[in-house]
Amino acid sequence: MPRSLFRTVLTALVAASCLIAAPALAKSRIKDIVSFEGVRENQLIGYGIVVGLNGTGDSLRNAPMTKQSLEAMLERQGVNVRDNNLNTKNTAAVMVTANLPPFSASGSKVDVTVSTLGDAKSLLGGTLLVTSLQGADGQTYAVAQGTVQTGSVSAGGASGSSVTKGVPTAGRIAGGGVIERETGFQMVNMDIMRLTLRNPDFTTARRVADAINAKFPGCAQAQNPTIIATRPPPGMDMISFMTNIENLMVEPDGPAKVVIDEVAGVIVMGDDVRISQVAIAQGNLTITVQENPAVSQPAPFSQGQTAVVPQSTVNVEEEKGKQLLTLGGAPSLKGLIGGLNALGVTPRDMISILQAVKAAGALQADIEVM
């Protein structure tokens, strides 16, 4: 093989090996880490009635609004029931909620959530009657109706015992809401579009602005850790501009954080969590108190009385074999977890240890307790 060809092949192999060994950067698309100004959902809410329940509806004593609503609805249908006794066991008053998607067109459908308002036991098999859904401005944007799907199962026996799986007092209607009014938001004539970072950070904001300016010079500026102001270049409308920039790749950054759920015993921490040099010792102390009541029997013919004498036994056990663990300065997440696992700690013990390390000033991260 000629020397020049050998040198070329060797150079190519070395370059390929470097590319394979190089760690991949955790980059994300801009549209996955920001929200566009005005492009958001709006919450809708309404009050309605579910009928067709199998005796699991509201009672007249605890839910008088159900009877009033039923009477008003029947009167609108031309039925006079003011002087008659109504049974609401097959009817339930409910609150209906939905999210109005951005740019939703009139006639499109959305899912709605139905939740009981009174003391109804279940919405299984019920049908929601026509219900208007209003926005925060009081305007009606959608109308909902349909069969409620609860996703729950109930079973009972003749003795009165029953088993319920799921939540039967709340359900959904897939495509049960029809959009009647549009929000009227338009992007075509906008001059400036502000991008809002979902996780505010100075570094990420600058990187987003740099990525946009690399493709469209002078069209983006980071105003603060949350907002990046953008302007389309001359001759380009806002829709085309957003289409071009939303798929640009950016490596997001953020402060080191440890999230703790004390109820479930869950700990979530990022790879950028660092810890200063610190020594950790952990031991479990178990205290057992056992009651052993004894009977005191008097001697014969002594005119004494039999009595119960309480006797308590207290045992204190401390787990042996635990060592003092020393973590060097700024170890990685792998080293931190490996060191804590070396102590044999459980996730719940690890929560207390991390909080103690943070209190000692050795944990270089924020702790967020859920």
Swiss-Prot record:
Q: Which residues form the signal peptide?
A: 1-26
Instruction: Name the source's superkingdom.
Output: Bacteria
Localization (cell): Periplasm; Bacterial flagellum basal body
User: By its UniProt entry, which InterPro entries does this protein fall under?
Assistant: Flag_FlgI
Kindly list the GO CC terms recorded for this protein. Answer: bacterial-type flagellum basal body, distal rod, P ring; outer membrane-bounded periplasmic space
GO molecular function annotations of the record: structural molecule activity
What is annotated about its quaternary structure and interactions? The basal body constitutes a major portion of the flagellar organelle and consists of five rings (E,L,P,S, and M) mounted on a central rod.
Q: Which family does it belong to?
A: Belongs to the FlgI family.
Record's function text: Assembles around the rod to form the L-ring and probably protects the motor/basal body from shearing forces during rotation.
User: Mind telling me what this protein is named?
Assistant: Flagellar P-ring protein
